[in-house]
Amino acid sequence: MDLLSNLRRSSIVLNRFYVKSLSQSDLTAYEYRCIFKKTPELGDEKRLLASICYKLGAIAVRIGSNIITKEAVRPEKLQGHDWQLVQMGTKQLDCRNDAHRCALETFERKFLERDLSASSQTEVRKAAEGGLIWWVVGAKGIEKSGNGWEVHRGRRIDVSLDAEGNLYLEIDIHHRFYTPWTVHQWLEQYPEIPLSYVRNNYLDERHGFINWQYGRFTQERPQDILLDCLGMSLAEYHLNKGATEEEVQQSYVVYVKPISWRKGKLTAHLSRRLSPSLTMEMLAKVAEDSTVCDREKREIRAVFKSIKQSINQRLQEAQKTASWILTKTYGISSPAIALSCDGYLLPAAKLLAANKQPVSKTADIRNKGCAKIGETSFGYLNLYNNQLQYPLEVHKCLLEIANKNNLQLSLDQRRVLSDYPQDDLDQQMFWQTWSSQGIKTVLVVMPWDSHHDKQKIRIQAIQAGIATQFMVPLPKADKYKALNVTLGLLCKAGWQPIQLESVDHPEVADLIIGFDTGTNRELYYGTSAFAVLADGQSLGWELPAVQRGETFSGQAIWQTVSKLIIKFYQICQRYPQKLLLMRDGLVQEGEFQQTIELLKERKIAVDVISVRKSGAGRMGQEIYENGQLVYRDAAIGSVILQPAERSFIMVTSQPVSKTIGSIRPLRIVHEYGSTDLELLALQTYHLTQLHPASGFRSCRLPWVLHLADRSSKEFQRIGQISVLQNISRDKLIAV
């Protein structure tokens, strides 16, 4: 069955610009094997190898369990106090090999970073999502500024290689949020706006600014804090490091922790020797601060509007930057041209409500009913006041949906503020009592500034086997907000508002599982999984495994997959013919190998794909308006197939406005399996349109990954994985 012949062709423009084809010397590297005196703990080897790369005096890259460089490492650099490198000779790299291509991209990125860093008028930083941030420092780079904040114009720049060895620049507009203030100044002015990350405002030995995770502010003085390991006070230490007497004397002690240390202890620092790492969220909170003047608030709102640049603005600016870099860095005088590719437009998914009635969006279930019914008894807890009435629009919505499904709901179990105990033990008993009465899902109305702890309520309820849907009382819910609250409540009660019409193809996967990991910077919550059938029917979520590194445990993946296969059997009375396993982010070496081998023994086919939220750049289309060539966002469902790299990039969402903002495509890599890329693309795209918890919007990620992602974050917040044993896996507690 030829899918491609039935798809509409489309011409796509990317924010990528051709640089050169790699030469034989570009593809040659020195290879070293690392011998550790003590075997690294599980999950630590890659981090240790990466740290060794910075100590070799040459640009070095990790590849598998080895290290490669473009120039020979000097003999005196081949050994550290607990490791030793052994040269294995030269290695010829091949761009058709994913690991080799990734290593070559890292080399090219490091070379580009070195060259861009040569200018005194700009700075280069590594971007959190990959690539480089190149921005203009000083007054010349400021686009907007206010009291303690600046927005600098810059570019996010990355490199990419295709399987043929062609090197491309990928360039996008980037705005860097920056504060010239110290932590001391920030907390004096905005004490209610929390800090997450801070940085030294002085250079370290490597001429960089060290970043920290922010801990807490104290009233302690630097001269009173003794650094036992150095035999001096905190004040003396900073004076020795170049601090002025004024900086030290006027500072309080703050506590910070290295970002890269999962179990790092808090370290004492000075409030005037640190600056906050300003984020868009912090700037938004400044605009909400009652002490900030109206003019300042207008300036901040203008910032948020100005950074949402259209694809046309982005591609035109990227083209100028690419031409400059080609000339200055690569010695290429020809102008940069955005890369054009042949693409396809995938057909939209067909959504189904009750009795397989077709709907265009999830909101239509209000008139059609839900595809599958769950619990019919609900609790209501009003922690806003002592009124027993449900929020009017939510109540109406629940009754309308129930009517369309020809059933009655039990909504009589209601409690108010005066019923809720203050003592922790009594609160736990409150939830246990409700659970014993058959209530397993509760709508909780409480204001954001309530003295009751939302997270504590959630955990106490989960311990009793109850899922909670929270709602703020003000402003009062209109029918749109009420519908989304109702959908969240129903999903947590095991309902399935909508399903999909299965893709009509013999090779389609009949069980799809999404995997994600979250971290609290000490432990990773991995193997959080969510599964659906080909028609979108939910098989629920699975408990995560707590692990040390971001690499999934192969055994934990198999345990999760096998549980979900058994669920599939219980529903379909057979084993699945094919699985599609989706991994959020990079698939690490060996993660899925055990599962693949065991499925082979059962003659169950499997495909593994990694879904990456970054690295796909921007996708646009050329159109003519008033006789001029302009760019517009590629239509939702647009896909570019890249068979040589076993990958595809696709548009799964749209900006709210055609003239403000631009969408971010997904990049999907086919890590294992024999299914055609176009079928994987179609099934992936249809799963992004399945969003039972939102009436009017689809997901950017496929639904199984969206839920796995939300679940991993929820499990991370809960922290106590054992409490999840009491709650049904059919209840989507993370929506």
Curated annotation (Swiss-Prot):
Cofactor: Mn(2+)
EC number: 3.1.24.-
Region span, N-terminal domain: 1-94
InterPro entries: Ago_PAZ, Piwi, RNaseH-like_sf, RNaseH_sf
UniProt keyword terms in alphabetical order: DNA-binding, Endonuclease, Hydrolase, Manganese, Metal-binding, Nuclease
One GO molecular-function entry: DNA endonuclease activity
Catalytic-site annotation from UniProt: 516, 550, 584, 709
Cofactor note: Cleavage is more efficient in Mn(2+), has weak cleavage activity with Mg(2+). Cleavage probaby requires 2 divalent metal cations.
Region (Mid domain): 370-498
Region (PAZ domain): 181-284
Enzyme class: hydrolase
Binding residues for Mn(2+) 3: 735
Residues involved in Mn(2+) 2 binding: 516, 709
Annotated residues for binding of Mn(2+) 1: 516, 584
Alphabetized SMART domains for the sequence: Piwi
Chain positions covered by the region annotation PIWI domain: 499-735
Region (Linker L1): 95-180
Effect of deleting the gene: No visible phenotype during growth under continuous high light (250 umol photons m(-2) sec(-1)).
Region span, Linker L2: 285-369
A Pfam family this chain is assigned to: Piwi
Induction comment from the UniProt entry of this chain: Transcribed constitutively at low levels.
Quaternary structure annotation from Swiss-Prot or TrEMBL: Copurifies with SSB proteins Synpcc7942_0079 and Synpcc7942_0301 as well as other proteins.
Protein family membership: Belongs to the argonaute family. Long pAgo subfamily.
Function, as annotated: A DNA-guided ssDNA endonuclease that might play a role in defense against invading mobile genetic elements. Uses short ssDNA sequences as guides (gDNA) to bind complementary target strands, resulting in cleavage of the target DNA (tDNA). The cleavage site is 10 nucleotides (nt) downstream of the target residue base-paired with the 5'-end of the gDNA. Both 5'-P and 5'-OH gDNAs confer activity; a 5'-OH guide cleaves between nt 10-11 and nt 11-12. Guide DNA mismatches in the seed (nt 2-9) can enhance activity, mismatches 1-5 nt after the cleavage site block activity.
Free-text note regarding domains: Has 4 domains (N-terminal, PAZ, Mid and PIWI). The N-terminal and PAZ domains are joined by linker L1, the PAZ and Mid domains are joined by linker L2. The domains assemble in 2 lobes; the PAZ lobe consists of the N-terminal, L1, PAZ and L2 domains, while the PIWI lobe has the Mid and PIWI domains. The PIWI domain assumes an RNase H fold and has the catalytic residues. gDNA lies between the 2 lobes, with its unpaired 5'-end anchored in the Mid lobe.
Name under which the protein is recorded: Protein argonaute
Organism (species): Synechococcus elongatus (strain ATCC 33912 / PCC 7942 / FACHB-805)
Origin organism lineage: Bacteria, Bacillati, Cyanobacteriota, Cyanophyceae, Synechococcales
